[in-house]
Amino acid sequence: MTKVLIWLASGDREKLMPGVIWGVNAKRNKWVDEVRVIVFGESEKTLLHDTELFGMVQEIQGALFCRFVAEKNGTAEQLEKRGAKVDYVGQPIAKAIAEGFTVLTF
């Protein structure tokens, strides 16, 4: 079973785009058995203001935005209003690694 965790951390749209596109295509075309997405750090702000990328990330069901970072940046409420799932991500990351997910960071 092949499982991938895409960890979006960059605030640069051009760096995020390959990870988001790959994740969406991997999910649609069943390239791997499971795809999860963690949105962390500066990428949260970038996605909040980039409707296209935000929508693509939301296509990957279960995408999780970091609550700690979002609260620190004052964006948690805005993200939730747009439909993002905002929660603490430390434990989900550790669990995914323990479950054998390959982590791809963008």
At which residue positions do the language-model features occur?
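C-terminal structural segments of small proteins and small subunits
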Residues: 78-106
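Short, solvent-exposed amphipathic alpha-helical segments in soluble enzyme
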Residues: 21-25, 54, 80-81
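A glycine-rich helix N-cap at a beta->alpha junction
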Residues: 52-79
